[in-house]
């Protein structure tokens, strides 16, 4: 009979809490059978006891007890079967990225519902899914997940994983997660309340914050078969559960069977570990070196830049503070100095103002005198110009007078000639008229008689005319010639008389002109006087003329004499003025020459004395200045040496700190260096010994680390060649307790090779070339080998083996067994510990060696750079002493300068007095000349007389010289001149009358023959007419000639007369100008002599020079006054400025003192003052320090960009007004660096020492890297052998798995198996790796690529037809190092008449596919357990459970096969089946979903042991 139990639940909500009412609880008819545990090699397998769902949809608080084998959930559609399984899977794999609960109709889909099937299966509030398990250690563990819906459109669910341990087996899981609040009500506890409840009952509650930790706990406690380290492992596990849940052959699993069935590289990876791990360690070492370098560089960079940044600002502030103090003191000194200068300037202003007033008054006087001198000079110049004009005009007038006289004579001659020519012309005109009349009369006659008659008549007329003119009544033709001769003689006598009168007239005219000229000259000189007194006046003038002429000639000498006297007088006045000035300046009253000469001698002596004293002081000052320059040069030399000396001292101090020694002399440094060399040699020997020991241990570890336990790699090649397996590999799984027995059992043959046929191998032994000295071969089946081949007896300390009938071998149990992986691993652990100890000792000794080397290097650098300076005296102390000496010298120099200034003032005063005396002494004789003024007056009177005579001579000298030769003509006045002139006129008239009579008589004489025509005069008429005509023509020609002569003489007379008029006009104008000039020069009132201009100019220049000197002095004084006034303003401003600067500087000093005190307090309290007070920076300028600080600031901004705290601290420190923030930043950096120091490597808190130790550590790591590089010499052949061994072992394991699947049958499927094959491309790769082709060795000898990359490149070489895609060589190489990529796995089934064929869903029925898929999943789980056996506790066998939803597709036989499979493989199975399915075995739950009002719940009835028997 079966036991029946039923539990009904109703759910209702009260006050927002989920309440449970138990309406009907039926007691279980027969109590559940106790949960039994099956054993696995003596270890019981863990089991899932129950599944508890709290507040799921339809299940408020339901616990499903799970059967040991099969638990069936039976019910209709929507009853809750899938929900129950979803709760189980959620508790098993609580990963929302994987969970996707779809029904079988959406199998293979990737989308599904939006909430992936979980959100809709939960109710609002807190939900739980809990698995109750009991593991191989009989520990009860409750693992589960708290679920809660998250409000929102995305239908998200929040998961919290937890575990509970220590709960009694009798405790119901439902009671743990709910709290009863009434007889029929309960509420769900939240996670915190659950934690409190579990802790109250004494159990352990643990919540997990990652799925990896949750699964790690489940693996450690034996709940899941495999450690799920990553999301990929969880995905595989979920795919396996999903494939199990939905049934069938999962393509996701079959496509990647290698990943599920084959374990990760254990053999190959372990073999490859020797090289790849070494590479990895090398890379880690490189990374460590990089990290160390980065830390070291960071430390160096931060310390250097921070020190530069803060120390430069610290020293700049210190310099500025010192500079501000000095500036304040300097401002105060300038303030006091400006006040003293102001007082001195005020006194000087008063003195200069008084002098300026005196100079102004003197200048006004000099200006008046100078203007007078200028005016006098102008008058003299005007007078000289007038005198020059007078002289020129006098000369011109004299010349004009002579020319005028000459011109008058010429005009008179021309006039006489003109009158004579006119008279002749008129006579010729009369004769022409007479001839014309005769000719006219002749022409009137018609014939010759008439003409003769006319001629006769004309002759009579001419006779009558002659009678009339001559007054001769008796004149006739006969006596006409006599009368003509008489009258002609009378005419000649009259002509002689006229000529005589003309001669007398010319003589009279000459006498008269001389008299008139002399009279005019006398009147010109003496004025208008009677003609009678002219001779007396002329005689008086001529008598005085020689004395006046002589006096006039003496005028220049008198002028020169007067000029010399006036100069002497001017010198006398100048000397008087100099004497007065000298007395005034010297405050003396010296008057006599003796007194002046004595004082002159005193001043010369004084000047010599002062000059001697001054030269002595100059020499002393020069000596002091030379001494000061020497001190300055010495100071500069020490100032140049000071930074280097300070740097050397800092280096020496660091060396003393590093070495712990104190060095007083350079020889101490050299001795210490020698001792360090000795110590370094000793430590190097210890290091080499430890290195040798470490290498031996590494060799043993490497030999024991072989996966098959072979110590000789040649054995692997021989085993592969013979087709056998190493004996050590067969006993690889032997326990550590049995390891001594088996090691002694086989003795020397523990490294034998197990082969199937010794005879086949014996033939190959002769061909062996490279093999161990002793090679043991044992015949047997490697897949089923045991120790029955040997006859052995175990003793207390060893084993006796019957080798043959006549040979026994006794082998003692080894103290350190190495047979079997467990023994080797134990020995490896011991060797690893020993190696770690040796490595630690080696590292310490190597560190000490490096430390010695670094210390010696530092000492060498110190010797090379600083030894010459480090032990010299302190330059700063010398500089202080030099400063004191320089200050003393400066004080002495100031005293010398003051004394020298006073001496120079005395010397200048003495020289000025001496200069005045030198000017005054040569003029002493002038001062004593008392009658100088009288002589000047006398000379001036003589000069006035002489100048008057000179003026008279200059004015009338020419006139007197003209008068002197003709003065005698004045003695008699020519009074008969007019009578003679009348007589001459009368004689000329008579001459004209006589000549007319002569002409008339001559006409009658010429016509005398005409008288004969009285009777017959007609015959000669024509001849007479012709003669008349000829005569008329002659007379006309003569008239024309005379007319031309008259015209010429008229023009000549006009020209001469015009010249005369011009001369007269010029004479009159110049004479008038001369009179005007004489009047003007008389009005000027000055003497225009030759020296007048020179004297006037000299006087003017002297006054101008005096005025200029006075003006210059006054200008200088006024400039000095202006300068003093401006300087007074400047001094006032300077006083205010210096006072303000002093107060400002004092405020700065006071204000900076507060901040400086804070800086000092911070630096001293943090022990940073010594690092900040870098004295060598004190010798840099503020700009250089600021530039250093700015550069360091820029570098620090980059360095601390990733550190928020330091970045903020640096930003705050940039405020220049608060230098203490920079010190705080410095402290923060040091604190940060102290925190960054790796205490496991560096044993110091000081970052400076940390840098040193980092250097040492870096050298050690570099040496270690070099050593490890030598270990990377693994060959490609060994890798290929290990890979083949691993593949062979896995093939054997797959064959063992196939044995468990041989008897499985589902429908027509009678058997299932796995087929393992090696890929052709990878087989070629293995052949290439194990071959001896030199063409491939270049890849593995290249140090620039890793072994993985070399593998990838080799794979590409031998398979050029395969496209590698975008994958890198490293990725491909890593895949090639995984032996699973060399294998192809396929699932085959033996189905009916088809025989063995590939297992595919299309070739199998649904039930066959489900069964086949379940078989594959069981194989995977079994493989996982085997793979994880080493990393799992030896007393743990994990739970084994699979799912199957919708089991209706399986027939009863198939279900029975599943039950059998579960029983045979010790597996639990959870299936879901329709209502009509009732398995014979296991536990079955009937699920019915009921609805009551608006509430629904699932009614569950559990059946155990239900089934029918045939």
Swiss-Prot record:
The GO terms describing molecular function are:
ATP binding; DNA binding
Q: Where is this region: Flexible hinge?
A: 707-824
Sorted alphabetically, which Gene3D superfamilies does this protein's record hold?
1.20.58.850, 3.40.1140.10, Immunoglobulin FC, subunit C (1.20.5.420), MukB, hinge domain (3.30.70.3500)
Provide this UniProt record's keywords sorted from A to Z: ATP-binding, Cell cycle, Cell division, Chromosome partition, Coiled coil, Cytoplasm, DNA condensation, DNA-binding, Nucleotide-binding
User: What's the short name of a Pfam family annotated to this entry?
Assistant: SbcC_Walker_B
Q: Which InterPro entries match?
A: MukB, MukB/SMC, MukB_hinge, MukB_hinge_sf, MukB_N_dom, P-loop_NTPase
* GO term, biological process aspect, one: chromosome segregation
Sites where the protein binds ATP: 75-82
According to the UniProt record, one GO cellular component term is: cytoplasm
Tell me where in or outside the cell this protein is found: Cytoplasm, Nucleoid
Please classify the protein's predominant subcellular localization into one broad category.
cytoplasm
Coiled-coil region(s) at which residues? 6-30, 346-506, 553-633, 673-706, 821-847, 876-1064, 1094-1149, 1249-1305
Q: Could you tell me which PANTHER family the record lists for this protein?
A: CHROMOSOME PARTITION PROTEIN MUKB (PTHR42963), DUF4476 DOMAIN-CONTAINING PROTEIN (PTHR42963:SF1)
* Domain notes per entry: The hinge domain, which separates the large intramolecular coiled coil regions, allows the homodimerization, forming a V-shaped homodimer.
What the record says about family reads: Belongs to the SMC family. MukB subfamily.
Report quaternary structure and partners.
Homodimerization via its hinge domain. Binds to DNA via its C-terminal region. Interacts, and probably forms a ternary complex, with MukE and MukF via its C-terminal region. The complex formation is stimulated by calcium or magnesium. Interacts with tubulin-related protein FtsZ.
Query: What job does the chain carry out?
Result: Plays a central role in chromosome condensation, segregation and cell cycle progression. Functions as a homodimer, which is essential for chromosome partition. Involved in negative DNA supercoiling in vivo, and by this means organize and compact chromosomes. May achieve or facilitate chromosome segregation by condensation DNA from both sides of a centrally located replisome during cell division.
Q: What is this protein called?
A: Chromosome partition protein MukB
Question: Which species is listed as the source?
Answer: Haemophilus influenzae (strain 86-028NP)
